[in-house]
């Protein structure tokens, strides 16, 4: 793959890949690692794509697979997050500490991913199923359960604002 083409694809799809990786991991560092690995695989494999949407779907599928690999890695199972170890947590980035975004980030990973792809990337249930390697019924179930959890979280916090 030519350098210019790789740079164009990073420019065109890098943010979508990052957002999915962040939705899956809730960690900026892990998301950045996944983005890097995704585009390295693109350059190494140089697959042929029918169109830009096919390329985007391929990149998101690879990113989802990389996130799964991260969760299954022996290193990941041995380490504990700093928050669990009693270290101070970093301040929330502006805008992520309130409302719906914080509620989405508080969801379990399997729900964060489908919510992100459905609402933020505007993908269909069929596209999400393909990218995450799930059945369409599973995606619909996860979307429904995620919406219920979000509704409960957001309704529980409405009365706490001054």
Regions found by a protein language model. Give the residues of each.
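A short pre-motif secondary-structure segment
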Residues: 114-118
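Structural recognition of an alpha-helix C-terminal capping motif at a helix-to-coil junction
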Residues: 19, 33-40, 44, 53-65
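A short, charge-rich alpha-helical start-of-domain segment used by transcription regulators
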Residues: 1-19, 32, 43
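Arg/Lys-rich amphipathic alpha helix in sigma70-family domain 2
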Residues: 47-50, 60-82, 93, 145
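Internal acidic/polar
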Residues: 69, 77-104, 124
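DNA-recognition helix of helix-turn-helix
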Residues: 64, 68, 132-156
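Residues within helix-turn-helix
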Residues: 29, 126, 137
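Residues within the DNA-recognition helix of helix-turn-helix
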Residues: 13, 34, 142-145
């Amino acid at each position: 793959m030519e350098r210019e083409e790789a740079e164009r694809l990073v420019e065109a799809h890098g943010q979508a890949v990052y957002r999915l990786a962040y939705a899956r991991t809730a960690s900026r560092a892990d998301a950045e690692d996944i983005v890097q690995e995704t585009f390295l695989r693109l350059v190494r494999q140089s697959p042929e794509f029918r169109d830009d949407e096919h390329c985007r779907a391929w990149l998101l599928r690879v990113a989802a697979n990389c996130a799964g690999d991260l969760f299954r890695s022996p290193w990941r199972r041995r380490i504990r997050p700093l928050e669990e170890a009693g270290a101070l947590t970093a301040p929330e980035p502006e805008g992520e500490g309130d409302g719906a975004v914080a509620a989405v980030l508080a969801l379990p990973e399997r729900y964060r991913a489908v919510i992100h792809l459905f609402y933020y990337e505007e993908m269909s249930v069929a596209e999400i199923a393909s990218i995450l390697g799930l059945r369409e019924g599973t995606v619909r179930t996860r979307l429904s359960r995620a919406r219920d959890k979000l509704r409960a979280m957001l309704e529980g916090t409405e009365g706490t604002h001054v």
